[in-house]
Amino acid sequence: MDFGLTNNSIKAFEDQKLLHIHQSCVSYPSDTLICSIPVSAKNVDLNIPFKNILWVDKTGPNSVTLSYVSRSSKVATKCWVDFVENSDQFCEYLLDVAYKGIKRSRRFIVFINPHGGKGKAKHIWESEAEPVFSSAHSICEVVLTRRKDHAKSIAKNLDVGSYDGILSVGGDGLFHEVINGLGERDDYLEAFKLPVCMIPGGSGNAFSYNATGQLKPALTALEILKGRPTSFDLMTFEQKGKKAYSFLTANYGIIADCDIGTENWRFMGENRAYLGFFLRLFQKPDWKCSIEMDVVSSDRTEIKHMYEKSKNLAPMSESSDSDKTVSTSPESHLLTFEINDLSIFCAGLLPYIAPDAKMFPAASNDDGLIDVVIVYSKQFRKSLLSMFTQLDNGGFYYSKHLNYYKVRSFRFTPVNTGKRHYFALDGESYPLEPFECRVAPKLGTTLSPVAGFQLLDI
């Protein structure tokens, strides 16, 4: 479709979902005026995917202001577009294609942990993410958390009907708080229908990367803004009569010790866990435990086939209460392990436990199963180093040094060895005492592109 006063100067290519604007029609806030005509300092044509368009406003019969996320600078950008044949028609068309099937001007409550990770969450929100939402005419109510569990207490009492979503600007710890605040409500089933999203701003940003595939806050914000309600599994965690929810991992062994045992290194960001890992490689492994698991499969070929099948299924855009029960098929069986030579026990729901750590290559966001990795301490350094070098792409899935399971639930009992060890739930420290986890299929909701988390090849 052609929208310019001259042929092909302003054109929408619907098959490519792309807007093309000739450089002669574009000017930016920093541009100068020559004879009252804006002269662009960027002497290139503008090509914007429909998805990247945030908003468009009429400024005159033949001119508009256009806000979009730049593919090159990856930030919210604003420009003026002149020589439009009919600005009313142009604005209506662009907003229709930019938000096709998606609610415009969403309302969010935003939790920001100003002290989490490297302490940059507030700056990240204000300089990178917020401009995307404000340019899209979204309403954002910001809450700066002041203490531990502050976000949890607000989420527990939140009027969920007043918002279209929750934004968590921080790391996985803040997201864990929000999830558990919703989980403590009497109406938790209804509350969990409210999408909970993450803008990366902490030392661990795993959920954000799993849900959007983006690292940059502005691009993450764009994916959320243009995202559709998407279900994801949770785990219920029970310990001494207390209940919590997990969206990511439950782990014991060297990974938990590297995570929780390096809390005082949070200023290092995601690098703290890697330093902790290498330091602990030179310590004698002495993790012991008893595990009982309701196993669906321990055959990696079969697990891969299950995963490939789930990849080919059409993504679900909305979850219903009827979805939130554990399927009775495929069949499962109980297995019990007494492990005196453990290196890693890690149970998870999503592929990435960090943006560069694909711990569960066969995990999908809503398959109703928990992925479990067990690594024994035989050939301790060799097996862990081999695994570590392939962690970024999940290549260790085929390693002979690990055991991989798909389970519905498990009961875990640590054995006291006299050494100080840790247990971590979503990267948060929990008592090192017996506990039980069960999958809660499709209980959580987020805003994700194409109504589904990206499932990559194993």
Curated annotation (Swiss-Prot):
GO CC field: cytoplasm; endoplasmic reticulum; endoplasmic reticulum membrane; Golgi apparatus; Golgi membrane; intracellular membrane-bounded organelle; late endosome membrane; membrane
Active site positions: D172
Known catalytic reactions: a sphingoid base + ATP = a sphingoid 1-phosphate + ADP + H(+)
UniProt domain DAGKc: residue ranges: 103-241
Primary localization: membrane
E.C. number: 2.7.1.91
Domain of life: Eukaryota
Binding site for substrate: G170, G171, D172, G173
Keyword Transit peptide in annotation: no
Alphabetical UniProt keywords: ATP-binding, Cell membrane, Endoplasmic reticulum, Endosome, Golgi apparatus, Kinase, Lipid metabolism, Membrane, Nucleotide-binding, Sphingolipid metabolism, Transferase
Molecular functions (GO terms): ATP binding; ATP-dependent diacylglycerol kinase activity; D-erythro-sphingosine kinase activity
BP-aspect Gene Ontology terms: calcium-mediated signaling; sphingosine biosynthetic process
Paired cysteines (S-S): none
Membrane topology summary: Peripheral membrane protein
Family annotation (InterPro entries): ATP-NAD_kinase_N, Diacylglycerol_kinase_cat_dom, Lipid_Phosphate_FormReg, NAD/diacylglycerol_kinase_sf, YegS/DAGK_C
Keyword Endoplasmic reticulum: yes
Residues reported to bind ATP: N113, P114, H115, T145, E177, G202, S203, G204, R266, R272, D426, G427, E428
Localization of this protein: Cell membrane; Endoplasmic reticulum membrane; Late endosome membrane; Golgi apparatus membrane
PANTHER family listed in its UniProt record: ACYLGLYCEROL KINASE, MITOCHONDRIAL, SPHINGOSINE KINASE
Physiological role: Catalyzes the phosphorylation of the sphingoid long chain bases dihydrosphingosine (DHS) and phytosphingosine (PHS) to form dihydrosphingosine 1-phosphate (DHS-1P) and phytosphingosine 1-phosphate (PHS-1P) respectively. Involved in the biosynthesis of sphingolipids and ceramides. Involved in heat-induced transient cell cycle arrest. Accumulation of phosphorylated sphingoid long chain bases (LCBPs) stimulates calcium influx and activates calcineurin signaling. Involved in heat-stress resistance.
Protein name: Sphingoid long chain base kinase 4
Organism: Schizosaccharomyces pombe (strain 972 / ATCC 24843)
Lineage: Eukaryota, Fungi, Dikarya, Ascomycota, Taphrinomycotina
Gene symbol of the encoding locus: lcb4
